[in-house]
Amino acid sequence: MKTVLILNFPAEGHVNPTLGITKAFSDKGYDVHYISTEKYKKRLEAAGATVHLHRDLLRTTPIHVGSPNGILDFVKIHIKTSLDILQIVKDLSKSIQFDFVYYDKFGAGELVRDYLDIPGVSSSASFLFGEEHLKILPLHPESGAPLELDQECEDLLAKMKETYGVAPKNLVQFMNNKGELNVVYTSRYFQPESDRFGDECLFIGPSFPKRAEKTDFPIEQLKDEKVIYISMGTVLDHTEDFFNLCIDAFSGFNGKVVIAAGEKADLTKLKQAPENFIIAPYVPQLEVLEQSDVFITHGGMNSVNEGIHFSVPLVVMPHDKDQPMVAQRLSELHAGYVISKDEVNAQILKQAVDEVLRNDQYTAGIKKINQSFKECMDMEEVMERIDELIRQKNK
């Protein structure tokens, strides 16, 4: 029986894509150990993992990523979390012999692989990036304005080297961990410029395990209705103005409008919505998408994949991170209509939804991507490739 150690970045868009493969490892009889935070413990245990917890600095530290200080704070969280994880790994490795480590692009993955000196498999929750995309990041040594570390960061990195004998090659490693194999939760068809990536990249498509969550959402109200579903994900702040635009745009819509407002939205700042609107902080997204005719989204990879899975055409309003790249790819494949967050108004929103509902090319484009997901490498083949890697390494 193999023993796998899984590491991840503690955010929805990173943890959720790994649930399928975590369950696959467990179902195959692997002993699965997953290092994460309290927030994700239950769902990881439901997928068959033994969970070991570290501090959730990401949720408890306010970060403004747009500012130089925000980027420094983000790096500091990575370094401190890596130290926490390395200590857990050091303790676990006294009694457990791990065969390989499976880790996210973000975080401590390569550090732990180097510390344990075992095979490493990386996991990409979004598209793969070419080197030219990484060079734009302030964390890259060749970026125009590389990030200056403060004394606290220098001291923490020195402590890492001294205590665990490992150090990042450069700061970009915290956002681009590589493995001897790289698992990608999309298809070669959807991946931009996919011919640049070799056979070490395993395109397995996204997985959609049923989430064990109870909700009082009135899903039956969506049956036999035209449905617009609107969500800006779980991370964005100050979404109230946008949701008010949606209320203006779709007050006359002949069907249901569902807004997943998120935990951060202040619902008292929203206008009085007509009766055909359902607005809630939390919405069971998979169930709602199953009934939806169009999905207005920020373009986060998780949400986009879920929309594709149910063949729901997309109106995409990207904000940051990988969202502009995802939006551009959807546009290239005629699967999404892209609108600018800086120019959006009620008229533009209404036009976008009318266009997507009226023009069949969007549904056809989405279905083509969905088909490519179904044709991805299956879990059995992924396991075989990992087994082969371990055998090679142990020769």
From Swiss-Prot:
The keyword Glycosyltransferase applies. GO terms for molecular function: hexosyltransferase activity; UDP-glycosyltransferase activity. Keywords: Glycosyltransferase, Transferase. Its EC number is 2.4.1.-. The keyword Glycosyltransferase applies. This is Uncharacterized UDP-glucosyltransferase YdhE. Pfam families: EryCIII-like_C (PF06722). Belongs to the UDP-glycosyltransferase family.
